[in-house]
Amino acid sequence: MVSRSSEGAEGPPPSAPKPPNTPAKSRLSRLGSSPSKREDKSRDDRMIKSSAKDVAELKDYQLGDCLGKGAFGSVYRALNWNTGETVAVKQIKLADLPKSELRLEIDLLKNLDHPNIVKYQGFVKSAETLNIILEYCENGSLHSIAKNFGRFPENLVGLYMSQVLHGLLYLHEQGVIHRDIKGANILTTKEGLVKLADFGVASRTTGLSESSVVGTPYWMAPEVIELSGATTASDIWSLGCTVIELLEGKPPYYNMQPMPALFRIVNDDHPPLPQGASPAVKDFLMQCFQKDPNLRVSARKLLKHPWIVNARRSDSVVPKSSTEYEEAVRSVQEWNEALRSPSAGTLRRPVKHDQSPIPVPPTRHTPTKDTLPSPVSRNVTDRFRSPVPTEEEEDNWDDDFATAISPSALQLPHLRPHDNFGGMLSSEKLKAFASLDGTMIKSDDSFGDSDSSFGSSRRSDEPDPLETIRPYPLKQPTAESTQLQELPRSQINKTSMASMHHVPILTQNPTPPTKQPRPASYYKENSIEDYSDLIQANEDVLDSKLGAFQEADENVDPFESSPSKEAIRNRASAEDVMGQQPQLRKQISVKRHRSAVEIQRFAENERDEDFSDLLGTDEVMIDQPESDGSSDQSTLMLNSKLSNNSWLGDQDDEDDPFAQLEEGLDEMDLEANIARDKHARLRNQVEGLVSSLKTSQDEDVLAEISEQLLTVFCDFPETKNIIISAHGMLPILEILDMCRRRDITSCLLKIVNAIIYNDYEIQENLCFVGGIPIINEFASKKYPREIRLEAAAFVQQMYQTSTLTLQMFVSAGGLNVLVEFLEDDYEDERDLVLIGVNGIWSVFELQGSTPKNDFCRILSRNSVLDPLSLVLSRVLDEDGELAEIVEGRIANIFFIFSQAENHVKEMVAERTVLHRVLKELRRMTPAHQITMLKFIKNLSMLSTTLDSLQNSNAIDVLTDLLRATMKRPHFREVSNQILNTIYNMCRLNKSRQEDAALNGIVPLLQKIVKTERPLKEFALPILCDMAHSGKVGRRELWRNKGLAFYISLLSDPYWQVTALDAIFTWLQEETAKVEEHLLDHRPDRPSFTDSIVRCLTISKANAFENLLEPLQKLLRLSPPIASTLARPDLFTRIGQKLHHSKAAVRLNLLRIISSICDSSEEQGGLLAKYGLLDAIRELEHDPAILVRDMAGKLIQSNEKSEAYGMGKRKPMVRRRSTSATPPNLLANQSAPSTPQMNRTSQSKAYYEGKEGSRHPRNALSGSALALRPGSRDGSTPSLTAGLNGSTGASRTRLPRGVSNRMSHVDLLSEEDSARPSSSLSRRQSVLHRRRRQTQADADWTP
């Protein structure tokens, strides 16, 4: 309670003053305020002091300076004149608080005694204030220390948390829930002790019921926010938040407003943990942040956590010296000095190592518990430095890059289409001139799972384009060659491998056995191109080098063929070089220096026909078994027929390799020449056109050239490779960038689109040279439709081919182009709009490294959902499969946006968009309707979007949709999303709850609860929250028999606690009406009393504990209802649970017994009647102080009841009144028992004769009813006025002959001013006779 006042201001908390003579603080105060401000402040302090000294009842104390101010009072330093002790006095205005509850709690909690708890020494009550006398903690709160000196180191936080846990453990064992653990409520002393303050009364001094969510939410547990009630586990959650507060300087979610913070606490798995926290601290916090309070660890278990144990081990909790506070402050100062130092980002210092230096990773700002000092420096910051990680812990990023990038990816830049020299003699062209013997094998253009460097590279058994096949003069074979022809092919392969492995390949970076970091130059393309990386060092190499070419592919990839150096030098033709062509073209100035050595080994030399260097020696070949090469296709075939298909070869001929050399040679040459001549002319024409594409050309000439080039390309698509090899893409892009003639632009865009179609490598090349922004420019609305369509086709290729092109397209502003397409008129530019929709959908569908959230953020800046919602409306007007596909894609885009970060959700939650989407919900197909409902549901999970949803009539539309889909097959999926959305919107908001009630949600929910079992769990929370809404919502509940529905829920073990809490809340708001219905017994429905008794009887362990709190509040609020529970079956159940292991359960059971006894005619005699007297007497020796006190008062009540002769009592008379308040409630029982308890027989006879024959109540009756909360609805008759002593329309019923009468005249006069005249006249005489006596009762001190 000491620090409660600190919530109202940023100053130090109440009993947490700043150290008076600290130089640093005085300097800060001098620097932070001007002389005039200091004078004003001192004047204000003097005024506060003077007003505080006016309290005459504080006769034994001299008030000093004000320690802190809050919303409900102020805290002063005070001196006890009798003992000389310094104390803290907290003054609370009675007008703001329920005095009866304060009185009882303080009376009970002042008996608590523990070193880690601020001692309550008593209180003094005046006419206007309640003065609570507390132990004075001279060093202030942990919050003030953190505010003045900075963040705490982990070891100091662990030491403090150990003491806090000891205090919490004591409180929990006494049945007290702190409810407000935070740094401002943890006070420190000079001895280094920390003490808990503001416990037990914290939730009540705010004047709020447990169902209210008001105030600073950052320390609240999820179950408190969800109105499930505070438990001891709630303190553990708050303790975790306090740890973060001390380590970080701020609690979790401090950068948010209260309502968003509440949503994050409930929805997140756990609050964000400090980034620099050690593993031990993070584990401790995760134990505190268990969402389920039943799984959350207790304070006793947390005391055994390694972090707390180590803290206690390093520094004992027992105070050692008076300088411990200064040491703690110095530790905090040194820690924050280390954080602010220039090397704060690199606190880890590398230790000198025998090996190469270890890269130092970025460090955390918070040390681990294993911090080690540096061996070099002994500065103050060294004690907080993290240890240097070992070699095993170091991250080698070079290894990551070495393994993440495949060799095939790195070698791709060496394979370019222009290396194929046009590809004119493709297999399709040559098919007319040559017959193909053998099997066609389809090559794969994509990356596969094989070990080859490139997916489309030749297979090991395919013909090798690097080998030169040429006829030799007929010659008698030598013995060696004859033997070679007789050996299997596999033996030749294996014997030749030894020579292959020793051939040097001139590469800049030979591949080592293990992956090593590669220099940047490795990724650059060399001007001297090399194909040596395609050579595979395995047995199949020679198969491809020396074998006959039986298998040819119709669709051979352009990258398959590359001419050898020897072939280029000896060709006389100007034709293209392809893997399928019969001859090689003339020498071309293309060099292959790096692979020359490797290829030269396979080139034939007229002067050297010895193959021993390739095939090995005879001895090696003899060692090979024949079975290794038994296949016909694997034998060595150099005796190919060079007639029609000589370049293809025939692997079935094994005899003389040159036997039929001259056969059909002239015929083949004639047909091949025709094909070569045709393609040569075509190539020359295309190369000439490309070379004429210059920006200096006249536009008319450019128009003619571009048109001719387009015509040739359309007739012969294979000219694509010629354009690429002639480097035609760059001239085309230059002209597109400079020229603005539409015909030229249109032709060139068509050529570009045809070249890049489904060729990701060419697309990447185009992106690398800056083609995307140039072509994206033509998507603008200022260009004609034809050009825009071509630009749209280019855009489509960019976003749907590969991840790399997509990333480059987005980086070049491509998403803006897609949004611009969406903004076109759907009627006129339907194709462009659909390209935009499909483009955005494809962006999200591609599985790349860029998160979808980033795309959402980029697109949300352009308000993409606004035009997209318009497109949705137009698409829904159409029929057909295409319209349904587009509808589904739009719905998926909306859904993806709702899964993005909160900033994106806030940007897309525009009223116009939401209104349009909600309007079209009814027209969408069921599957897409559910997807769009998920979009709305996800938006409703963010508090900042709820107003936009409400303004878009979301509740109205969703309620109508729920009603319309009740009979449809997809009702369960639709209602699941709708109910979640309505629950998120109506939660903690009365206006939206009333809006939903007015739209008829209550009967729909009741129907769902009765018929749909799985959906019941979604509907019941909304229904139970309706009791917390305003008059409109409760009126709808009355209309639909909501109270009877709540009573029926008491039989459901999973919802009985929520239902009882709803009934109690409704009773608070409309006490008389609800009480009348609860007491109304009808044969056609179960009574409330029977339901309560059955509920307590059948409830399980956890449900039983949670039922007690709202039940005892309800009985305290309504004595007539409490009197109906004086039943043997209920008392039997209570008797079984009186010895429960938890002190809080025992205490609540005793409070329930007290409320029932007080409302009954027999009062304390019920204990003996139902056999609870012995059990309660045993509880007088309970270890929990509060349980002992309550049990003792019940025993006193029983004894007094026996003394007054309970059997002679007259029945209780209920007086008529115009007030809606139940007539047997006490007017005000805020005063404790006074020496005038036992009044004279004459005064007792006077009361009994005038106002009834009831026997006097004991002190317990006043105590029990003093805890009765008031109604929050000021417009309806409530109990607040009577209980708080303020004016109101309520009328209370005084017990006849009550022993503890009204405490002072002020409260009586306030109550009588609110009474009807008849009641007032009957009381005036009594008031005059008892004025002196009530004046003497003004002190609360027992």
Swiss-Prot record:
<comment type="similarity">
    <text>Belongs to the protein kinase superfamily. Ser/Thr protein kinase family. CDC7 subfamily.</text>
</comment>
<feature type="region of interest" description="Disordered">
    <location>
        <begin position="552"/>
        <end position="591"/>
    </location>
</feature>
<feature type="active site" description="Proton acceptor">
    <location>
        <position position="180"/>
    </location>
</feature>
<dbReference type="GO" id="GO:0051301">
    <property type="term" value="P:cell division"/>
</dbReference>
<dbReference type="InterPro" id="IPR011989">
    <property type="entry name" value="ARM-like"/>
</dbReference>
<keyword id="KW-0175">Coiled coil</keyword>
<dbReference type="GO" id="GO:0005524">
    <property type="term" value="F:ATP binding"/>
</dbReference>
<feature type="binding site">
    <location>
        <position position="90"/>
    </location>
    <ligand>
        <name>ATP</name>
    </ligand>
</feature>
<dbReference type="InterPro" id="IPR011009">
    <property type="entry name" value="Kinase-like_dom_sf"/>
</dbReference>
<feature type="compositionally biased region" description="Pro residues">
    <location>
        <begin position="11"/>
        <end position="22"/>
    </location>
</feature>
<dbReference type="InterPro" id="IPR000719">
    <property type="entry name" value="Prot_kinase_dom"/>
</dbReference>
<feature type="compositionally biased region" description="Basic and acidic residues">
    <location>
        <begin position="36"/>
        <end position="47"/>
    </location>
</feature>
<dbReference type="InterPro" id="IPR008271">
    <property type="entry name" value="Ser/Thr_kinase_AS"/>
</dbReference>
<feature type="compositionally biased region" description="Low complexity">
    <location>
        <begin position="1"/>
        <end position="10"/>
    </location>
</feature>
<keyword id="KW-0418">Kinase</keyword>
<feature type="region of interest" description="Disordered">
    <location>
        <begin position="336"/>
        <end position="396"/>
    </location>
</feature>
<dbReference type="Pfam" id="PF00069">
    <property type="entry name" value="Pkinase"/>
</dbReference>
<feature type="region of interest" description="Disordered">
    <location>
        <begin position="1201"/>
        <end position="1342"/>
    </location>
</feature>
<dbReference type="GO" id="GO:0046872">
    <property type="term" value="F:metal ion binding"/>
</dbReference>
<dbReference type="GO" id="GO:0005737">
    <property type="term" value="C:cytoplasm"/>
</dbReference>
<keyword id="KW-0723">Serine/threonine-protein kinase</keyword>
<keyword id="KW-0808">Transferase</keyword>
<feature type="compositionally biased region" description="Polar residues">
    <location>
        <begin position="369"/>
        <end position="379"/>
    </location>
</feature>
<dbReference type="InterPro" id="IPR016024">
    <property type="entry name" value="ARM-type_fold"/>
</dbReference>
<protein>
    <recommendedName>
        <fullName>Cytokinesis protein sepH</fullName>
        <ecNumber>2.7.11.1</ecNumber>
    </recommendedName>
</protein>
<dbReference type="InterPro" id="IPR053235">
    <property type="entry name" value="Ser_Thr_kinase"/>
</dbReference>
<dbReference type="InterPro" id="IPR017441">
    <property type="entry name" value="Protein_kinase_ATP_BS"/>
</dbReference>
<feature type="compositionally biased region" description="Low complexity">
    <location>
        <begin position="1315"/>
        <end position="1324"/>
    </location>
</feature>
<feature type="coiled-coil region">
    <location>
        <begin position="658"/>
        <end position="695"/>
    </location>
</feature>
<keyword id="KW-0067">ATP-binding</keyword>
<feature type="region of interest" description="Disordered">
    <location>
        <begin position="1"/>
        <end position="47"/>
    </location>
</feature>
<keyword id="KW-0479">Metal-binding</keyword>
<feature type="binding site">
    <location>
        <begin position="67"/>
        <end position="75"/>
    </location>
    <ligand>
        <name>ATP</name>
    </ligand>
</feature>
<keyword id="KW-0132">Cell division</keyword>
<keyword id="KW-0547">Nucleotide-binding</keyword>
<comment type="function">
    <text>Required for early events during cytokinesis including localization of cytoskeletal components to the cytokinetic ring.</text>
</comment>
<keyword id="KW-0460">Magnesium</keyword>
<keyword id="KW-0131">Cell cycle</keyword>
<dbReference type="GO" id="GO:0004674">
    <property type="term" value="F:protein serine/threonine kinase activity"/>
</dbReference>
<dbReference type="GO" id="GO:0106310">
    <property type="term" value="F:protein serine kinase activity"/>
</dbReference>
<feature type="compositionally biased region" description="Basic residues">
    <location>
        <begin position="1207"/>
        <end position="1217"/>
    </location>
</feature>
<feature type="compositionally biased region" description="Polar residues">
    <location>
        <begin position="1273"/>
        <end position="1290"/>
    </location>
</feature>
